[in-house]
Design a protein with these regions (language model features):
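Helix N-cap motif at beta-to-alpha junctions
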Residues: 4-5, 73-76
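Vicinal oxygen chelate
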Residues: 19-71, 79-107, 115-120
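Conserved phosphate-binding and hydrolysis motifs of nucleotide-dependent enzymes
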Residues: 4, 106-109
Length: 120
């Protein structure tokens, strides 16, 4: 969930390098979809919170745990691009048995993993 469509679109497209797929006005809201990779089946719907209860969950939709996992085929390219765009990382990149990973927070404080499998 997001608090403002335009602010969320700006963050996901400018900071994370996502592409805006759809932005369709509806009654009092918008259908806003972004994708990390145009042409892929992976999309993210940016839904604006519509009441106080939902607003309370913005940034804590997974109770402080990693919420989403962004897989890449070139970790260092994407990590460096995101860093230069001002994305805030909560730790240094590390090597795990499954690959290279780093945790970052989006503009709302939701935690994400950027990772590349060893096989990639």
């Amino acid at each position: 969930m997001v608090d403002d469509y335009d602010r969320a679109i700006k963050y996901y497209t400018e900071k994370l390098g996502f592409t805006l797929v759809e932005d369709i006005p509806q009654l009092g809201k918008r259908w806003v979809v972004v994708t990390p990779n145009p042409g892929s089946d992976c999309n993210l719907l940016l839904a604006r919170a519509s009441n106080e209860r939902q607003e309370g969950f913005i940034g804590n939709q997974c109770g402080g745990r990693v919420f989403l996992f962004l897989q890449t085929d070139n970790f260092w390219r994407d990590y460096n691009a995101m860093r230069s765009n001002g994305v805030e990382f909560s730790q240094e990149p590390r090597e795990e048995e499954y690959g290279t990973v780093v945790v970052f927070e989006d503009l709302y404080g939701n935690r994400w993993d950027l990772y590349q499998n060893k096989q990639s």
